[in-house]
Amino acid sequence: MGKLYLGFDAGTQSVKVAVYDSSWTKVASHSLPTTLGYPNPGWVQMDADEYVANTVTCMKACSDELRRKGYDPADVAAIMGDGIICGITGIDADGNAITPFINYLDSRTKEDVDAINSTPREIWGRETGNPEASCMFPAMFARWFLKNSDAFKERGVKFVHDAPYILMHLAGLKAEDAFIDWGTMSGWGLGYRVMDKVWSEEQLEILGIDPKYMPKILKPWDIVGKLTAEMAEKTGFAEGTLVC
């Protein structure tokens, strides 16, 4: 029947997984709702591991649907995904989340944003296209984690977005392999050189964020790994399927 392609969207309100054939006809799909937590006024946070669990469940539903329709899940050539570009979690050396996933709806960084913006800096607009900080920027969430998360201060290794977090777990990657694509990079708001598609050491120094915490920047179509045996068993797709 030809090659199939699996994609997911790890969004604010749901995780959606779909499989398409080579003519871009949808042949299977499934979605599950996400959970938004509001622990304090102005705070909005999620669970990165719920994103992984929902994706795995949706993938299993899709592989079952494919089999019912006479398709072979082993024909899936690649697994791809996108998610929330203005949201991050902190991970440990094993690649596991040790902080909540804070997204763009959160405003806990308002005072810090006001403090940053009290000193106008030309570099923000020149390098990122954003003239000032905003509560929705992951750069500000990173500053908050570095100041307020004991878990990250003790064991934190990288900051990652939700889609890369899911893809890392599907491929069994550790923090040393943490990544972000150059489209999602723009969601950071500050801390990068948009034209060069690299992190800005000068901006990160101003922000007080050590570059060691930043994931490597890849092309959106780069292959990051292969579906592990464990995830193959859980999802019903073939071990070794490319993850990108």
What do these predicted regions represent?
Residues 106:
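Carbohydrate-associated surface elements
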Residues 85, 109, 141-144:
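Hydrophobic side chains within alpha-helical segments
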Residues 10-12, 125-244:
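Gly/Ser/Thr-rich active-site cleft segment
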Residues 48-51, 55, 109, 138, ...:
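Conserved donor sugar-nucleotide recognition element shared by glycan-biosynthetic enzymes
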Residues 1-100, 115, 215-216, 232-242:
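N-terminal glycine/serine-rich phosphate-binding loop of ATP-dependent small-molecule kinases
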Residues 121-123:
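Metal-dependent DNA phosphodiester-chemistry modules and their immediately adjacent helices/loops
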Residues 112:
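Active-site metal-coordination/substrate-binding segment of hydrolases
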